């Protein structure tokens, strides 16, 4: 079968069409041809394709194919892309696409990113000249994917399959477009088989109809056997479609009148001709009836290269669109002819997963099927599929439902964002799937939808980590739900009542049928109703379990977030809902997927409110991910109680409803908590390399914190009619920069948060100052209502300010969420910022993501704020009581130590005291109050619980001595406020004892600036500090570096906390008080330089027992008491003034302790230093040792290699010697041979005349012919194969020669195989002993030594002698290096004997006589000198020392000649 003309031009023939053989089939050309044919057809319309674009290739004069310049120009100019893209991606008809970038952006808005080999294709790539075809192919593939997802969706496929299949199993559900296509084909073909079965049975009873099948080509083989036609199952879309059986059967089912079953070749084993027949049938059908939608050649469909998978998918999607959406007149699905019944249709169409699920759960499931699903079946068959909004989220399907095999990707890249929220685990599990509405249009390439490749890296872990249960849970109907009441959970019902088809932008029609669990069409609730449902039903599920709270971080309480979400949902208009229907594209985890984040540009303000953007793409993630589960859940859960639908998995929100839920509109619902944003960013950055947004594959959206019910607020009816609002097209281009912008927004939000908290702190401090001033004014009067009022007023101010800021921030979409978080956290003390794991917050706060509106929070905030104010007032009440006690103490102390003031020298005070002083100052004093780090969610101090509550107070004039740690200490004033932390601020303080277990007391530090009386008190305070430091050690150590607060004006400190009732406050007994002299047992803290501020610090616990207020002496002795307290409880601390002596003693002890501690620290430091040095030295030594080992290893390796080489050389030499059996014999042999030398010499000279007589011509000839060869070979030792084996024996210049360097090499390598001794590569030596060099010698004599007619006689004679000899090895004796022939010897390698056979020379030759060895090169007909000293069987000629020839050379040669002859 030779090459055919363009296969597209071939007409179907009943002879096998000519096709290109597989080895001649160019896959890359085929891909280009298919892509360009499709693109041109979509750009110009199949009827209007210009002639020059019909075949994109031309052949040059060298028979090389190239793309035609017009096609290249159209590609480079983007005209084709703009034309096709405008048809396929027309979300905005008013704004035509112009340029490559516009098309890329439009695709990105669809969630499809153009990637070539995992790199994003840019406009520059598409403009490159010469054309970069791979980028253009990627672009076309992405357009094809966009078109594919417009034509076909998993939901439509399932709805279609429900018409033809009575029962579905959960495992049958398709999970991406490719799988959906195969699912559709298989279901339809199964139904066709059922029809044929019934027809065959009927034929048995109605034989008249039997002839109808006579023409079928399969009938001869199968029908006669009464077998059904073999319609293969499609398991691999490409490979199983190569024979055309399944596809032709599918076409027959839909168009039985056009493509008759009898015309299809259906066999068990299909031949090539059969396959071509079917494929040709398919092509002709598509060309004639389906507007040339098949852009393949026969070879393309037959060989089914993986590169054309996207082409095949778009072809199948178009078939589906024609058959199930457009349904032209010729599309009339086949029914059972004899009875006119449709067995499959009679069977109720069961929602795919519901059937399987109900089999498990409902005993009466079978009875329910018919009642529940008959209507949906009928409706879906009429409409051709569950209606999806025109935007048809690309691959929105059952991506997250369950993991299936991952497939290779199209041209997209994406990555997965998976959030795991503990709080959603409990309540959302049963409801997980509820929100996946059938109308999940906004979804972009879902994992399920994305071609199988797209799902490559998807993580299918459910949000709450319950991976195993994901499928069942999604389908689970809450047992409390009313299964009988079809809930109007889905606005899809808007479309369910419409059987009309809405034209997609690309002409695809979409039908959306919304059915309840019983198959009844659902009346979707209004948005307000849906929101109300959400509001009412969602709270219970959101209540987190305690363990969930502990395990997760919840920035916001759920109640508020739910309230917000409800409000925002109410605020969002149906228009927004409509706009957002396409809003969010799930992000696939695959690195190869074209999916991206779909964020509706309409819905998201230009500012890209962080929350909304985050939420948008996260929500879309979830909603998209689970289209399949969504479909099933819609069936399943519609009947269930609305509460089920409210599972906190916002991910289930369909993208359509997302605008409502996520408030993607400019108002921007803040759906994301900071922690969640960070978490997302972490996940997001993990996938950054993928080049596209990631998609959540888990069915739950709980991590999104969006109420499920929002999904019910599906797009209103107009949504179906507005194809232009394709969700996937919204803001995709901006999403490309989302990651960077999210980071910026996060920073802005954090800054705003700090700002808000700083303002709040300032207000709180003002309030505290007012309260303290009031307390000072009315020391002896009980609680001052003014103070409470002031506190309340301050709180109100703070609240009002915060509210105003909140309003302003609301205007700024990005900050609104952060403000909501801040406000909630600041205003609701119990559920404060929980950055620390120990302080869990209401999960609902974590759900702040869903909080749509913050204005509605005001009431709740007011309540909580009021509570905090009340708590503050109670704290102030304690302070008032304490003030009274302190006034009594002050009077006593003033009497005792009126003028005494001592300053603690800088080294004396313990650093912890310093720290404590500073902490209180910073936390309590307004000057220090600025934005607390503690205000931020993270408590600055690790152990805020242990911090005792103290307030900074007034300072005196005493000097501060700067400390090396930059803490300035005012000697006389010691403030022991606890380190600032979440618990230190009432607004952030958690009052649950578990959270602040150690906080047992509140301290009020205050004093008059100028009172010298307070200095003694301060002294006692300082004394008591060490004891208190024990109690507050953790906190004390934490802020050594905090700023000192100016003592003079810091008159007020915040009420840091109330005493925690949980902790036991043991007040010092009088016995304890009587031990004032007892040294502070805990000079653990290095003393800090005393402060100038005069503070009297009294534990509130002391205030509580009334008796202590009366005992002033108790206060004098209080320090030791306090120390005892600290020893026992470490919770109640107070500062009291003592005698100077006691203070001095205490100071001395403190100094000693400090010195001891310093020494200890120095020792520890030195020890640590030594250890570090030792470690460093050890590391260096290790490194040195390793380096030495490496070097030694290298040297050893080198030496080993050298040794191996030397050993190899030695063995080679030994081998050579062994071959010749001359392993260096002892010298005695040589001596023995010496005795024979005279004879040989004598004989040599006697015989030598022979040559002059008979062979002068011979020698001259041999000189002439051999000299060149020998001279060339003299230096052959230079570098030859054999020279390697005998390198030690090279004789570089035996005699000057012309070309001799290479002779040896050539001789040895090209000599005849018979010698077997030449070097032939890695083998340096070949055993020749068993062979004979007889023929080599004969060749040498005939062609070299005795060549020519002149030497004919001598040559014949010598050859005859050789024939007579039994020897295997012969040697030629040369006169010298000139290679003149003298005689022929026999050589026995075993005995190493060399005996003369004929010619002139010694009778025998010994080793010592040999001077040179020669090897004959049969090709060059020359002898080459062998650079060796050892004789072996590979030697063909030798020379002997010249002195052996010269003896009596002229003596009577003629006499000897006759005798010799």
UniProtKB/Swiss-Prot annotation:
Residues 896-1007 are annotated as: MBD region. One of its GO terms (biological process) is regulation of dendrite development. The modification Phosphothreonine is found at residues 401, 652, 970, 975, 977. Residues 730-767, 861-900, 1138-1210 form a coiled coil. The keyword Acyltransferase does not apply. Residues 677-687, 787-826, 1011-1028, 1104-1124, 1163-1224 have a biased composition (Basic and acidic residues). Residues 943-962, 1259-1271, 1306-1318 have a biased composition (Polar residues). InterPro entries: CAMSAP (IPR032940), CAMSAP-like_CH_dom (IPR022613), CAMSAP_CC1 (IPR031372), CH_dom (IPR001715), CH_dom_sf (IPR036872), CKK_dom_sf (IPR038209), CKK_domain (IPR014797), PRC_barrel-like_sf (IPR011033). The modification Phosphoserine is found at residues 391, 393, 439, 572-573, 585, 647, 654, 836, 905, 910, 981, 992, 1120, 1285, 1291, 1293. Belongs to the CAMSAP1 family. Interacts with CAMSAP3. Interacts with KATNA1 and KATNB1; leading to regulate the length of CAMSAP2-decorated microtubule stretches. Interacts with a complex formed by AKAP9 and PDE4DIP isoform 2/MMG8/SMYLE, which recruits CAMSAP2 to the Golgi. Interacts with MAPRE1/EB1. Key microtubule-organizing protein that specifically binds the minus-end of non-centrosomal microtubules and regulates their dynamics and organization. Specifically recognizes growing microtubule minus-ends and autonomously decorates and stabilizes microtubule lattice formed by microtubule minus-end polymerization. Acts on free microtubule minus-ends that are not capped by microtubule-nucleating proteins or other factors and protects microtubule minus-ends from depolymerization. In addition, it also reduces the velocity of microtubule polymerization. PANTHER family: CALMODULIN-REGULATED SPECTRIN-ASSOCIATED PROTEIN 2, PATRONIN. This is Calmodulin-regulated spectrin-associated protein 2.
């Amino acid at each position: 079968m030779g090459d055919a003309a363009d296969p597209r031009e071939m007409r179907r023939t009943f002879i096998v069409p000519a096709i290109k053989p597989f080895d001649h089939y160019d896959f890359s050309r085929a891909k280009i041809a298919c892509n360009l044919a499709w693109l041109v057809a979509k750009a110009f319309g199949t009827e209007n394709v210009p002639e020059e674009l019909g075949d994109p290739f031309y052949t040059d004069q060298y028979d090389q194919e190239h793309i035609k310049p017009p096609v290249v120009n159209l590609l480079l100019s983007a005209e084709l892309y703009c034309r096709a893209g405008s048809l396929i991606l027309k979300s905005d008809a008013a704004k035509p696409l112009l340029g490559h970038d516009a098309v890329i952006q439009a695709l990105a808005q669809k969630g499809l990113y153009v990637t070539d080999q995992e790199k994003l294709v840019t406009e520059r790539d598409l403009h490159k000249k010469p054309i970069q075809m791979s980028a253009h192919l990627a672009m076309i593939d992405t357009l094809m994917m966009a078109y594919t997802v417009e034509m076909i969706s998993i939901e439509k496929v399932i709805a279609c399959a429900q018409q033809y299949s009575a029962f579905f199993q959960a495992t049958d559900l398709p999970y991406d477009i490719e799988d959906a296509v195969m699912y559709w084909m298989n279901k339809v073909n199964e139904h066709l088989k059922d029809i044929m079965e019934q027809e065959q049975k009927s034929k048995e009873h109605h034989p008249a109809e039997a002839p109808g099948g006579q023409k079928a080509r399969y009938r001869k083989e199968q029908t006669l056997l009464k077998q059904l036609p073999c319609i293969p199952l499609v398991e691999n879309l490409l490979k199983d479609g190569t024979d055309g059986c399944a596809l032709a059967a599918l076409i027959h089912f839909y168009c039985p009148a056009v493509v008759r079953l009898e015309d299809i070749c259906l066999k068990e084993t299909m031949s090539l001709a059969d396959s071509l027949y079917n494929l040709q049938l398919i092509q002709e059908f598509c060309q004639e009836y389906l507007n040339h939608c098949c852009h393949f050649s026969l070879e393309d469909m037959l060989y089914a290269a993986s590169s054309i998978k996207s082409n095949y998918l778009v072809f199948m999607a178009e078939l589906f669109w024609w058959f199930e959406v457009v349904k032209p007149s010729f599309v009339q699905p086949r029914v059972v002819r004899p009875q006119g019944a449709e067995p499959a249709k009679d069977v109720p169409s069961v929602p795919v997963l519901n059937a399987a699920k109900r089999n498990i759960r409902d005993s009466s499931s079978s009875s329910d099927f018919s009642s529940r699903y008959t209507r949906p079946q009928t409706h879906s068959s009429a409409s051709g599929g569950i209606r999806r909004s025109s935007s048809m989220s690309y691959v929105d399907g059952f991506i997250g439902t369950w993991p299936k095999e991952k497939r290779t990707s199209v041209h997209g890249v994406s990555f997965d964002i998976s959030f795991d929220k503990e709080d959603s685990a409990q309540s959302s599990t049963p409801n997980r799937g509820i929100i996946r509405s059938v109308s999940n249009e906004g979804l972009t390439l879902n994992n399920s939808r994305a071609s199988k490749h797209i799902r490559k890296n998807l993580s299918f872990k459910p949000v709450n980590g319950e991976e195993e249960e994901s499928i069942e849970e999604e389908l689970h109907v809450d047992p409390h739900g009313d299964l009988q009441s079809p809930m109007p959970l889905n606005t899809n019902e808007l479309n369910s009542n419409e059987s009309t088809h809405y034209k997609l932008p690309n002409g695809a029609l979409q039908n959306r049928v919304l059915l309840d669990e019983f198959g009844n069409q659902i009346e979707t609730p209004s948005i307000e109703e849906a929101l109300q449902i959400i509001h009412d039903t969602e709270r219970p599920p959101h209540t987190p379990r305690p363990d969930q709270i502990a395990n997760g971080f919840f920035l916001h309480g759920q109640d508020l977030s739910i309230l917000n979400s409800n409000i925002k949902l109410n605020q969002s208009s149906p228009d927004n809902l409509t706009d957002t229907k396409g809003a969010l594209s799930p992000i696939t985890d695959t690195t190869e997927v074209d999916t991206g984040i779909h964020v509706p540009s309409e819905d998201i303000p230009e500012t890209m409110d962080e929350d909304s953007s985050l939420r948008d793409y996260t929500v879309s993630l979830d909603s998209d991910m689970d289209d399949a589960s969504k479909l099933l859940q819609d069936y399943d859960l519609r009947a269930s109680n609305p509460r089920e639908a409210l599972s906190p998995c916002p991910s289930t929100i369909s993208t359509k409803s997302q605008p409502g839920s996520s408030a993607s509109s400019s108002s921007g619902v803040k759906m994301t908590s900071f922690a969640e944003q960070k978490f997302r960013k972490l996940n997001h950055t993990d996938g950054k390399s993928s080049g596209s947004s990631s998609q959540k594959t888990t069915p739950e959206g709980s991590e999104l914190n969006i109420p499920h019910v929002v999904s019910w607020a599906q797009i209103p009816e107009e949504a179906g009619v507005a194809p232009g609002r394709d969700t996937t097209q919204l803001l995709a281009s901006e999403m490309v920069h989302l990651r960077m912008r999210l980071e910026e927004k996060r920073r802005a939000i954090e800054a705003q948060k700090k700002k808000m908290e700083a303002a709040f702190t300032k207000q709180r401090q003002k309030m505290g100052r007012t309260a303290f001033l009031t307390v000072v004014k009315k020391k002896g009067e009980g609680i001052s209502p003014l103070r409470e009022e002031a506190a309340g007023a301050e709180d109100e101010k703070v609240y009002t300010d915060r509210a105003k800021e909140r309003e302003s921030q609301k205007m700024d979409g990005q900050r609104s969420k952060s403000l909501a978080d801040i406000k909630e956290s600041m205003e609701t003390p119990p559920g404060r910022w929980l950055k620390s794991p120990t302080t869990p917050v209401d999960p609902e706060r974590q759900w702040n993501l869903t909080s749509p509106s913050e204005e509605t929070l005001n009431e709740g905030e007011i309540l909580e704020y009021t509570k905090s104010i009340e708590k503050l007032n109670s704290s102030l009440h304690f302070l008032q009581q304490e003030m009274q006690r302190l006034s009594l103490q002050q009077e006593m102390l003033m009497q005792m130590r009126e003028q005494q003031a001592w300053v603690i020298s800088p080294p004396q005070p313990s650093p912890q005291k310093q720290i404590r002083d500073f902490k209180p100052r910073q936390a309590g004093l307004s000057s220090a109050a600025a934005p607390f780090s503690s205000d931020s969610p993270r408590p600055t101090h690790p152990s805020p619980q242990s911090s005792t509550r103290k307030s900074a107070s007034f300072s005196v004039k005493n000097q501060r001595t700067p400390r090396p740690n930059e803490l300035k200490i005012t000697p006389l004033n010691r403030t022991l406020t606890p380190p600032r932390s979440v618990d230190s601020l009432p607004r952030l303080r958690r009052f649950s004892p578990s959270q602040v277990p150690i906080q047992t007391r509140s301290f009020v530090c205050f004093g008059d600036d100028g009172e010298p009386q307070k200095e003694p008190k301060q002294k006692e305070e300082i004394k008591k500090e060490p004891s208190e430091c024990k109690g507050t050690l953790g906190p004390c150590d934490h802020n050594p570096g905090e700023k000192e607060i100016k003592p003079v004006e810091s008159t007020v400190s915040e009420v840091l906390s109330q005493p925690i009732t949980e902790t036991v406050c043991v007040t010092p007994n009088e016995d304890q008080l009587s031990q004032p002299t007892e040294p502070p047992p805990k000079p653990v803290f290095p003393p800090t330089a005393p402060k100038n501020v005069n503070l009297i610090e009294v534990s509130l616990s002391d205030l509580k027992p009334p008796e202590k207020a009366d005992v002033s002496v108790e206060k004098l002795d209080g320090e030791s008491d306090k120390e005892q307290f600290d020893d026992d409880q470490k919770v109640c601390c107070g500062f009291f003034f003592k005698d100077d002596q006691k203070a001095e003693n205490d100071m001395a002890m403190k100094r000693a302790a400090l010195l001891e501690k310093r020494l200890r620290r120095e020792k520890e430091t030195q020890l640590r230093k030594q250890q570090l040095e030792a470690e460093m030295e050890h590391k260096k030594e290790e490194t040195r040792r390793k380096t030495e080992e490496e070097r030694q290893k290298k040297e050893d390796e080198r030496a080993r290699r050298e040794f191996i080489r030397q050993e190899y050389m030695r063995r080679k030499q030994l081998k050579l010697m062994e071959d010749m059996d001359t392993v260096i014999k002892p010298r005695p042999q040589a001596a023995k041979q010496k005795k024979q030398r005279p004879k040989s010499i004598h004989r040599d000279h006697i015989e030598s005349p022979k040559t002059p007589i008979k062979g002068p011509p011979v020698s001259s000839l041999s000189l002439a012919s051999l000299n060149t060869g020998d001279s060339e070979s003299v230096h052959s030792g230079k570098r030859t194969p054999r020279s390697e084996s005998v390198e030690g024996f090279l004789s570089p210049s035996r005699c000057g020669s012309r070309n001799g360097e290479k002779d040896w090499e050539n001789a040895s390598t090209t000599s005849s195989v018979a010698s077997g001794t030449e070097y032939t590569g890695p083998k340096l030596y070949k055993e020749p002993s068993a062979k004979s060099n007889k023929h080599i010698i004969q060749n040498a004599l005939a062609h070299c030594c005795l060549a020519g007619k002149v030497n004919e006689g001598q040559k014949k004679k010598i050859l005859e002698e050789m024939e007579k000899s039994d020897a295997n090895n012969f040697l030629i004796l040369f006169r010298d290096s000139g290679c003149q022939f003298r005689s022929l010897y026999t050589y026995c390698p075993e005995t190493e004997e060399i005996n003369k056979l004929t010619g002139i020379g010694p009778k025998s030759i010994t080793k010592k006589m040999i001077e040179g060895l020669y090897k004959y090169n049969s090709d060059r007909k020359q002898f080459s000198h062998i650079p060796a000293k050892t004789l072996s069987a590979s030697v063909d000629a030798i020379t002997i020392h010249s002195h052996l020839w010269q003896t009596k050379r002229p003596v009577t040669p003629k006499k000897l000649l006759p005798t010799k002859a």
